[in-house]
From Swiss-Prot:
It holds the Pfam family ACPS. It comes from Koribacter versatilis (strain Ellin345). GO terms for cellular component: cytoplasm. GO terms for molecular function: holo-[acyl-carrier-protein] synthase activity; magnesium ion binding. Mg(2+) binds at residues 8, 57. This is Holo-[acyl-carrier-protein] synthase. The lineage of its organism: Bacteria, Pseudomonadati, Acidobacteriota, Terriglobia, Terriglobales. It is found in: Cytoplasm.
Length: 125
């Protein structure tokens, strides 16, 4: 059964501006070390960062918290299965909230271009 859904769209140039202006401080506040390593290893790193930003926002919507109740950006981590399929992993307070809702699985879909990144998360029991 679907317990929650979330979707978000991000303007890639906005993320590029934040990275340019705040550098490692921005990256470290939003992304986990593994996410930073992955994105920086790709030619289109800014698009990848934007897609992960959108995924984290979508996940916040799927569990219904936003950035309230002790939930942080690092509570949501985008990974990849060996075949390339994106995954959403909940940590800390976000994991507690998702489990409290009965959530056992999060489905993530992301897409990005030079201008936009979009992500959708479905929380399922």
């Amino acid at each position: 059964m679907i317990l929650g859904t979330g979707i978000d769209i991000v303007e890639v140039p906005r993320i590029a501006q934040s990275i340019q202006r705040f550098g490692d401080r921005f990256l470290g506040r939003i992304y986990t070390p593994a996410e930073i390593r992955y994105c920086q290893s790709k030619a289109n790193a800014v698009e990848r960062f934007a897609a992960r930003f959108a995924a984290k926002e979508a996940a916040m919507k799927a569990i219904g918290t936003g950035m309230r109740g002790g939930v942080t950006w690092h509570d949501f981590e985008v990974g990849r299965e060996p075949g390339g399929r994106p995954t959403m992993v909940f940590h800390g307070k976000a994991a507690q909230v998702a489990q409290g809702l009965g959530g056992r699985r999060a489905h993530l879909s992301v897409s990005h271009t030079e201008q936009y990144a979009v992500a959708s998360v479905i929380l399922e029991d």
